[in-house]
């Protein structure tokens, strides 16, 4: 039905009133193209950034990272914190598990002096602190580690063995209803780290489930399943893990993409290893035998030497990362100058 001039005039008056009362941009036509591009925080793994489809974790959204114990969940979150801080952002870490290692966080690039840390006594306290920080409008990223450790006050104050069915799920549901809108308004990324549990009596399908009820599954714009798939060795020594991350939910881009990357003990995600893997996969870096070359110059013999070479030459690593993202059309970051060609590391 065609809009008459009177109806059009009435609509424009209503839109003007909405903008005046609730702020400009409260309502708009989808075709106006006034939506800002999605801002992201890089994860530290180029493979994971590409799998997310937008170049990193979205600003102003809820992100859930879950998986088995020691799979790399906190490592991924801390890398995102470090990247947010490098961009001049303010980060908070709500350590409900009381297990944050400041030395390890510093090795991953986190500015521990500037990091806001809270070790709350109850789940209510943790989520209230988070709400107040987000409401300040000054925060860029907040991490909650972990949902399983957000124990309701009634459970802590009660007797051992008391039943508190659904208490944590109700707490999470109430908190997320309140916080989600504020996250969007303040462009704050909230990362909830979660643990896995097994449902009893499941014979078909996966018995695995996450803690905290269903609210987080609904409110999360991105859900990442992180698993350790292989132990990395140098000789007889274990030096790290090969990690697989599956994007099981993504409201920003197509879901179900898979990324693989290396986590080195004491160092975190190997950014350089990810660049080499993705570079070879997409034909930017050539592999001949055990040698890796870029643009006719040898990077090194073997993965470890090539990784060390890129670590020693960050300009080249940045150029390769830019070329890979440019080729895939994801999170392109332009640089003014190409890096010089450099001498390779022999193995």
From Swiss-Prot:
Swiss-Prot/TrEMBL keywords: ATP-binding, Cytoplasm, DNA damage, DNA recombination, DNA repair, DNA-binding, Nucleotide-binding, SOS response
Domain of life: Bacteria
Any GO molecular function: ATP binding
Matches recorded under InterPro entries: AAA+_ATPase (IPR003593), DNA_recomb/repair_RecA (IPR013765), DNA_recomb/repair_RecA_CS (IPR020584), P-loop_NTPase (IPR027417), RecA-like_C (IPR049261), RecA-like_N (IPR049428), RecA_ATP-bd (IPR020588), RecA_C_sf (IPR023400)
Subcellular location: Cytoplasm
Residues reported in the UniProt entry to bind ATP: 67-74
Any one of the GO CC terms: cytosol
SUPFAM superfamilies for this protein: P-loop containing nucleoside triphosphate hydrolases, RecA protein, C-terminal domain
GO biological process: DNA recombination; DNA repair; SOS response
PANTHER family tied to this protein: MITOCHONDRIAL DNA REPAIR PROTEIN RECA HOMOLOG-RELATED, RECA
Family statement drawn from the similarity comment of this UniProt entry: Belongs to the RecA family.
Protein name: Protein RecA
